[in-house]
Amino acid sequence: MVFAKISQLAHYAPSQIIKNEDLSLIMDTSDDWISSRTGIKQRHISKNETTADLANKVAEQLIEKSGYSASQIDFIIVATMTPDSMMPSTAARVQAHIGASNAFAFDLSAACSGFVFALSTAEKLISSGSYQKGLVIGAETVSKVLDWTDRGTAVLFGDGAGGVLLEASKEKHFLAESLNTDGSRQGLQSSQVGLNSPFSDEVLDDKFLKMDGRAIFDFAIKEVSKSINHLIETSYLEKEDIDYLFLHQANRRILDKMSRKIDIARDKFPENMMDYGNTSAASIPILLSESYENGLLKLDGNQTILLSGFGGGLTWGSLIVKI
C-alpha cells in the first residue's frame, strides 16, 4: 500500500505589520480591548502582494527545502477564500510561477477549514498510488475583503500563507479524520461578493466579509470540541498519545475553552494569533511551519498531532497525523 507523509513545511507573511495601537487611530478600539478578547496583538497586511504572491513564496521554499525540481511535483492545491481572480486559480498561478510543468493545480474553498480539507484531499490523491508529490498551501489576503471601519471584523484578520510538501511513504502517517459542513448555518459568516447578472434587477454590491462572532465562538466550542473528542475516541488513541493540537488560530479564548472541553492540557495547544491574527486557511500551516522552526515539531515521524480547522460554511474538520 501507498501512504502519504508531510515532509516539508514553509510559511510567509507580508512585511507590513499593523499593531492594535495603529487600529485605534482609525476606529473605536484599543490594544487592551482587542488583546483581552482575542489574544491578537498585531497582524501582517499586504500592500501590493496578491494571494498568489504569498502562495508563490511558500511554494518556492518548499521546493528549495525538498531538493526536488518543480517538474517532479504532481499536483498543487491552494486553500483560499480570497483568490485574486475567478480564473485562473491561485494554484494555477503558483504552478506557472515555480515551473511545475507536470502538475495539475486547483483551488479549494472551505474558509478557515480550507487547509484541513485540502490536506485530506491531497492525502487521498497520493494514497491512490497515482501521484507521488504534491504541494498543499493555505494562502489568504483577507485584508482586501474587510470593512476597515468595522471593529468586529477588521481587528481580527491578517494576511499570510503556509504550506506543506506531501509525498508518498511506505508507512501510515494519516491516522484519522473527520470533515464536516452545515450549509444551513452559512449566514453566520459570509462575504456576499457576487456577480451582477445583466438579466436581473438585483444588485450585489456587499463586498465585505461579515461575521457573527458570538455565534462562531459558540459553534466552535460546542460542535468542534465534540467532533475532536469523537475523532480521538474512534481513532483508538488515548488523549495522552496526542503530542500537540494545532487548531485554527481565531481567538485565544477559543483555545482556552477547547482545552477544557477536550480535557487536554493547554500547553499542548500552540498559538501564534498574537503575531498574525486570524489568517483563515493559512493559520494552521503557518503555525506548523513556525513550530518546526522553533523546535516544537521534529518532522521525524515520531510525533502525533491533531489539526483542526473551523469557520464559515459552516465547515469544520480535523486530522490526526504522524509527523
Swiss-Prot record:
Entry note about domains: The last Arg residue of the ACP-binding site is essential for the weak association between ACP/AcpP and FabH.
Entry keyword set: Acyltransferase, Cytoplasm, Fatty acid biosynthesis, Fatty acid metabolism, Lipid biosynthesis, Lipid metabolism, Multifunctional enzyme, Transferase
Active site feature: 112, 248, 278
Role, per record: Catalyzes the condensation reaction of fatty acid synthesis by the addition to an acyl acceptor of two carbons from malonyl-ACP. Catalyzes the first condensation reaction which initiates fatty acid synthesis and may therefore play a role in governing the total rate of fatty acid production. Possesses both acetoacetyl-ACP synthase and acetyl transacylase activities. Its substrate specificity determines the biosynthesis of branched-chain and/or straight-chain of fatty acids.
E.C. number(s) listed in UniProt: 2.3.1.180
Signal sequence interval, chain numbering: none
Matching InterPro entries: ACP_syn_III_C, ACP_syn_III_N, FabH, Thiolase-like
Region called ACP-binding, residue ranges: 249-253
Domain of life: Bacteria
Pathway: Lipid metabolism; fatty acid biosynthesis
Protein name: Beta-ketoacyl-[acyl-carrier-protein] synthase III
Subunit structure of this chain's protein: Homodimer.
Main localization category: cytoplasm
PANTHER family, per the entry: 3-OXOACYL-[ACYL-CARRIER-PROTEIN] SYNTHASE, BETA-KETOACYL-[ACYL-CARRIER-PROTEIN] SYNTHASE III, CHLOROPLASTIC
GO process annotations (BP): fatty acid biosynthetic process
Natural source organism: Streptococcus agalactiae serotype V (strain ATCC BAA-611 / 2603 V/R)
Pfam families in the record: ACP_syn_III, ACP_syn_III_C
GO MF terms held by the record: 3-oxoacyl-[acyl-carrier-protein] synthase activity; beta-ketoacyl-acyl-carrier-protein synthase III activity
Keyword Protein biosynthesis: no
